Amino acid sequence: MNAKHAPFRHYLDLADARLGSQVVAVSDEWFAPASRMLQAGEPVWKEGVFDDSGKWMDGWETRRKRFEGHDQAVIRLGVPGVLKGVDIDTRFFTGNHPPAASLDGCFCTEGDPDDSTSWSEVLPAVGLQGDSHHYHPIDDERPWTHLRLNIYPDGGIARLRLYGVPYRDWSSLPPGTALDLAAAVNGGRALACSDQHFGRMGNLLNPGRAINMGDGWETGRRRTPGHDWVIVALGHPGSIEAAVVDTLHFKGNYPESCSIQAAFVEGGNEARIEAQSLFWRELLPAQKLEMHQEHRFERHLNALGPITHVRLNIFPDGGVSRLRLFGSPQLP
């Protein structure tokens, strides 16, 4: 399966270190640490660069196994989630990649797994090629807190992407609790946008403030009439009480203004939602923006009641680092 036919790539990467995901156990990392697999950036090749262990590689690499068994790494997800698909990426590993790999999962209510933990198969053993992406859909609705990557018998993996939906027990929230319903860690997801030439739309929902301009959503320079936009599905229906539009790091390329539309959508696919968004009600009327600044809007918001989706419009183009939508989830 290639990237074009892997629609699950639009979901959140639950293994992203920026979410707090980390390697908590590893059988071997002689040549390169397993933590590199979880980096958000694309792997790179550094010609002629060596360290004390050998050739520097941007990923996890174990030593050559001279006895029975295989290598494995256990990842604690920053937020529990249901997997929709995975990418086992071996870019730049040629001649030192594993010929096969598999994934197991577990759900720990407290702490990390131990010898008594029961693991379930998430992805059976699949063949791997060197210097390649390996996309595999996952049809399993069980949530996981930890994933175990098994490589057979040894070798190197550049990146492990675990695409899915964060799991949260919304019924356990006290009534009236307000939180960022658009946050990726709460299940928020960017569905569609007019353009993402310089920065991916999903970056808008990342935790914390942006680390640089590349950690936001940025469109190309608009040379035709109109404006740019992005549609976000909230992690849970709710009533919005405050909106934050952050232009941190965007100075000569921030939008002149923005507005937000919203709706309560039941059913329909992404194409239908995109078409309908033109006619959604106005949550936030057009507001002026400043460069490199966090803009918080409360009194400007219209009271629309519970919503499920928003459309952020930016005029005419530019970059926004974060979108936050604080409100109370609509609970049963």
Curated annotation (Swiss-Prot):
A Pfam family the protein falls into: Allantoicase
Catalytic activity of the protein: allantoate + H2O = (S)-ureidoglycolate + urea
Keywords for this protein: Hydrolase, Purine metabolism
Enzyme class: hydrolase
Family matches, as InterPro entries: Allantoicase, Allantoicase_dom, Galactose-bd-like_sf
Domain of life from the UniProt record: Bacteria
UniProt-recorded Gene Ontology molecular function terms: allantoicase activity
Pathway membership, UniProt: Nitrogen metabolism; (S)-allantoin degradation; (S)-ureidoglycolate from allantoate (aminidohydrolase route): step 1/1
UniProt KW Transcription keyword: no
Family (UniProt): Belongs to the allantoicase family.
Alphabetical list of NCBIfam families matching this protein: allantoicase
Name assigned to this protein: Probable allantoicase
Organism: Pseudomonas aeruginosa (strain UCBPP-PA14)
Taxonomic path: Bacteria, Pseudomonadati, Pseudomonadota, Gammaproteobacteria, Pseudomonadales
Gene name as annotated: alc
